[in-house]
């Protein structure tokens, strides 16, 4: 029996940023963690900033996504994002600095509501980048220090 693969496409406003095949795609949607394989029920979900794992046979592509929407059909996964980076292209020091800067804003009692919202978004993105980096290295990352 021939193995069937999902078609996977990650698109941003700039166009397709990742195309491939997978026997399993794992990600966090609005309802929690999802594992998607060939033949999956159709669904549409929002995505927070996080990690998408695209596995084909013994190889896994680890992707950081800034958040967006995922559309699943039995044969295809399409992820629409504002931004996507492969984990191997992420910079750990930059992500850690962004996390520290965001936490400093959140600790500032004089920060405006707009600054707090922006800092919360940057903190979630930095945490997701660190999780993607550590997932690709086989490490576990906890955002609670």
Swiss-Prot record:
Membrane topology recorded in Swiss-Prot or TrEMBL: Peripheral membrane protein
Entry keyword annotation includes NAD: no
Stored Pfam families: ATP-synt_DE_N
GO CC field: plasma membrane; proton-transporting ATP synthase complex
Cell membrane in keyword set: yes
Gene Ontology MF term list: ATP binding; proton-transporting ATP synthase activity, rotational mechanism
TM ranges: none
PANTHER family the record matches: ATP SYNTHASE DELTA/EPSILON CHAIN, ATP SYNTHASE EPSILON CHAIN, CHLOROPLASTIC
HAMAP family (UniProt xref): ATP_synth_epsil_bac
Protein name from the UniProt record: ATP synthase epsilon chain
Organism per entry: Francisella tularensis subsp. mediasiatica (strain FSC147)
Gene name for this UniProt entry: atpC
């Amino acid at each position: 029996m021939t193995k069937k693969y999902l078609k996977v496409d990650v698109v941003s406003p700039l166009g397709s940023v990742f195309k491939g095949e997978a026997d399993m795609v794992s990600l966090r949607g609005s309802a929690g963690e999802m594992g998607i394989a060939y033949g999956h029920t159709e669904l549409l979900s929002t995505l927070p900033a996080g990690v998408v794992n695209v596995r084909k046979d013994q190889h896994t592509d680890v992707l950081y996504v800034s958040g967006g929407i995922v559309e699943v059909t039995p044969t295809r996964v399409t992820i629409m994002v504002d931004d996507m980076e492969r984990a191997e292209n992420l910079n750990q020091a930059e992500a850690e600095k962004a996390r520290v800067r965001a936490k400093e804003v959140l600790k500032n009692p004089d920060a405006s509501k707009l600054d707090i919202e922006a800092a919360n978004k940057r903190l979630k993105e930095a945490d997701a980048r660190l999780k993607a980096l550590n997932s690709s290295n086989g490490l576990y990352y906890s955002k609670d220090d």
